[in-house]
Amino acid sequence: YWRGLSGWNFYFLVKFGLLWAGYLNFHPLLNLVFMAFLLMPIPKYRLHRLRHWIAIPVGFALFWHDTWLPGPQSIMSQGTQVAEFSSGYLLDLIARFINWQMIGAIFVLLVAWLFLSQWIRVTVFVVAIMVWLNVLTLTGPVFTLWPAGQPTDTVTTTGGNAAATVATAGDKPVIGDMPAQTAPPTTANLNAWLNTFYAAEEKRKTTFPAQLPPDAQPFDLLVINICSLSWSDVEAAGLMSHPLWSHFDILFKHFNSGTSYSGPAAIRLLRASCGQPSHTRLYQPADNECYLFDNLAKLGFTQHLMMDHNGEFGGFLKEVRENGGMQSELMNQSGLPTALLSFDGSPVYDDLAVLNRWLTGEEREANSRSATFFNLLPLHDGNHFPGVSKTADYKIRAQKLFDELDAFFTELEKSGRKVMVVVVPEHGGALKGDRMQISGLRDIPSPSITNVPAGVKFFGMKAPHEGAPIDINQPSSYLAISELVVRAVDGKLFTEDSVNWNKLTSNLPQTAPVSENANAVVIQYQGKPYVRLNGGDWVPYPQ
């Protein structure tokens, strides 16, 4: 009654091939149990055939579970948003899932299996490989089944401008520092480290003054929050040398957005004055001192809210108000020219027109203080030009946006207005994709998605910064932005004869790269990225 695996041999061979190539989050024990179910001897042939019918949905579910594709929870949570996508965008997404090289390789594997199975009992080899994979999980606490680097030396980086130091076994996290990474990267140790990280972050905050000094200088703060822009996207689009980057005074080269979705990213930015909370804590009330714009309002800064879209998709505007504390009325959008149509068919307005409207409005409020939050959507996946259903080329849209920002910066310089512009992208657009996610898919907040080009530029200074931007190469996040704002909040640097740029940018808060969505967490541990899906075990992120 031992009938072998028959056609299921091909099922497991495909899995082994995908595992070797690094495309699977393989679960050896579950697959071994499934294989045992298929091999278990059943005398009656009808029951044997019934088993195969039962195995089909089980095998499909297990295959899905072994991939990096979004799980049922993620699909259900995002289902209402997916339903709002235009039909053209949905077809575009489906087309991206088709990997013709992979299909060709699977076809070759099918022919090879059919040919060799005439003389070889393939089941014996398939069972042997499955047993070997399970033995591997028992013989070592951490291993990788795909070609990747080996574990690196244990290093921890402390806060401020301190250099990286080798950690000792008894290290404890110091408030303001990143927790030490000394233990082997097992699931238990990574969970413990993540809990330590969040516990330390809860105690971090930016302290704003109770009031401004009498000689404080009024200025405007403009925070530009760009959707779908990471350093990886900039490189893929060939725009690393765009003049915009040289226009900044300060550039963050390792700024972590902490998430790969718009709503959570905006909330994190609006709550920048406290340490990084977990994803769940984003949707719980925070201390009043965490809200960056509320801290500024207490010092006399008038709040403004701008968007180049309606903010309705995914309840973005609602999240910004309820969880980000931004209660200001949305700036009037009537009469703005439409530059693009969003992935849900709603208009995306011309950003230069929006910025010029802001500039005109602020000029009416001379000698006052304002803080404006501006959210931009032109780079989001699926946006297209009016009258064209196909997604507009990312490079064309990015080039246009960078040109517009550069032109706006030039106009600000000519105006002489005292303005601090802070650019913080929400997250990347996954332009290149990787082994875990196709291009445009952001369910998992990978390092290439969450490492974003944040920058700061001061306008109207008596002694402006000259030369190349000051690069901040330490791992940073929103707390560093809040710290820069509080260091400039009295506005005195706009009128100083000489600005101490080293003092302004040194000892900024550092934050370990931890990124989280509802069902996925990615951390950097001992120089390597690790991912945890749906509360399961940690595995190395495929490189």
PLM-predicted stretches and their roles:
Residues 283-290, 391-401, 442-450, 462-485, ...:
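A short beta-strand-to-alpha-helix junction
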